[in-house]
Regions:
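Beta-loop-alpha module in the N-terminal Rossmann-like domain of NAD(P)-dependent dehydrogenases
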Residues: 49-111
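Active-site loop of classical SDR/Rossmann-like NAD(P)-dependent oxidoreductases
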Residues: 12, 35-39, 281, 324-336, ...
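C-terminal helix-rich "cap/oligomerization" subdomain common to oxidoreductases
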Residues: 68-70, 266-267, 298, 303-305, ...
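Residues that mark the start of a beta-strand
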Residues: 1-3, 144-147, 270
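A contiguous active-site-proximal alpha/beta segment in oxidoreductase catalytic domains
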Residues: 76, 99-162, 167-175, 180-183
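Contiguous beta-strand/loop segments that form the cofactor/metal-binding neighborhood of enzyme cores
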Residues: 159, 177, 181-303, 334-340, ...
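N-terminal Rossmann-like dinucleotide-binding module
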Residues: 1-48, 186
């Protein structure tokens, strides 16, 4: 049985354990370090009887003999704890983004020995939809890729304006929160080491306003009439209600509500990626179109489809991928890969170097949007 330690055991880490790691029956939660110790023990204590509990990650790493560590803290602590785990040379599952500043990226680049034993949480790159698209492209079916058009219309985006994700000091902003996934799978499908130039623009046209900073929805005089209050959201979108929601029209919401990134690779290939956080319900889409001289292949995570268009005939192939599980089944594949890394059977399929590359691209996009300049990588 593999002994896994968790640094941070919030909804993402605990959910990943229960839905993806635990079902294999090969791991046990040996230790958890989280400052919310008593709160977490109250929920998980009975289910994890063999777990040793800590409030301090350094103490956990010093005292426990672990086969692997899952870092599931908030984003501004990912690098700090990756460096801690690296001191013990233990396989690491690291949540994205791996870093939110250039300084943190430099720190991660100082631990190259962790590259192939770190599984970065990039489940989209290993989702079956992406695997099918990559296979089509690698076989030369569409010819050399001449353009990529990628998109993400996030229909569950209230969390980025009502909850803690609105604090960009913690998250680094929505390029690092959302784009990091998509830019990674684009690099992976293309088999590229990243673009040479990045530029981006962002806008904030909806979730802005002059309400007081820190205002909670329940304390607002417009609670019963505001279409974004939990009171009204509950009527038509019950899965998207945020507990203790803060006003998304306050002065401290942070985060753009739409943005577009343009990237150019060494050979001149141009890639566009656009994201918005205004679309709702059926308007949600996430995927990309890869265009070559001989054909086009596109996919969409929401509809679970891959479509191939032959440019030389009227042929159109539609492939339905009925993947189940979070992130289109990618989380389960990452969990299996992490187990294989811990047992020495395989190396990471989403190594630290790719997490660093994606973070660099996102930071370049953020800098470009803020300075209205092209940024060289």
């Amino acid at each position: 049985m593999l002994n896994v330690g968790f640094i941070g055991f919030g909804s993402r880490a605990s959910g990943f354990w229960k839905r993806n790691l635990a079902p294999f029956g090969l791991c046990t939660v040996k230790a958890i370090a989280d400052p919310r110790l008593e709160e977490i023990k109250a929920v998980w204590g009975e289910e994890l009887p063999d777990c040793t509990w800590y409030t301090n990650a350094e103490e956990m790493m010093e005292k426990e003999k672990l086969d692997g560590v899952f870092v599931g803290t908030r984003c501004n602590l990912h690098t700090k704890y990756a460096l801690l785990v690296a001191k013990y040379d233990v396989p690491l599952f690291l949540e994205k983004p791996v870093s939110i500043t250039d300084e943190e990226i430099a720190q991660l680049e100082s631990i190259p020995h962790m590259d192939k034993k770190t599984v970065v949480s990039f489940p989209l790159r290993v989702a079956q939809l992406v695997t099918v698209v990559k296979d089509i492209i690698d076989r030369g079916v569409i010819g050399e890729v001449a353009q990529v058009q990628a998109y993400n219309n996030v229909n569950y985006a209230r969390v980025y304006y009502h909850g803690w994700y609105r604090d960009t000091d913690i998250t680094g902003g929505l390029f690092l929160q959302k784009s990091t996934h998509d830019l990674d799978y684009i690099n992976y499908v293309l088999g590229r080491t990243g673009p040479k130039t990045v530029c981006a623009m962002e806008s904030k046209l909806v979730f802005k306003g002059d309400k007081p900073a820190g205002l909670k929805c329940v304390d607002c005089p417009e609670y019963l009439t505001c279409s974004e209050s939990p009171y009204n959201i509950e009527k038509y979108d019950t899965k998207r209600v945020i507990a203790n929601a803060k006003c998304c029209y306050a002065t401290d919401t942070g985060n753009h509500d739409s943005a577009t990134v343009l990237m150019q690779y060494d050979d001149g290939l141009c890639v566009t990626y656009t994201q918005n956080f205004i679309a709702r319900k059926g308007a949600g889409k996430r995927g990309a179109r890869f265009i070559g001289y001989k054909g086009t292949v596109e996919f969409d995570f929401n509809s679970k489809t891959v479509t191939y268009y032959d440019h030389m005939s009227d042929r159109v192939d539609n492939i339905s991928i009925q993947s189940t599980g979070s992130h289109s089944g990618g989380d389960l594949k990452l969990a299996q890969n992490f187990i294989d890394v811990m047992t020495g059977k395989d190396v990471s399929h989403s190594p630290l170097s790719q997490g660093i590359l994606s973070a660099k691209m996102c930071l370049a996009a953020r800098k470009s949007a803020q300075t209205h300049t092209f940024v060289e990588l």
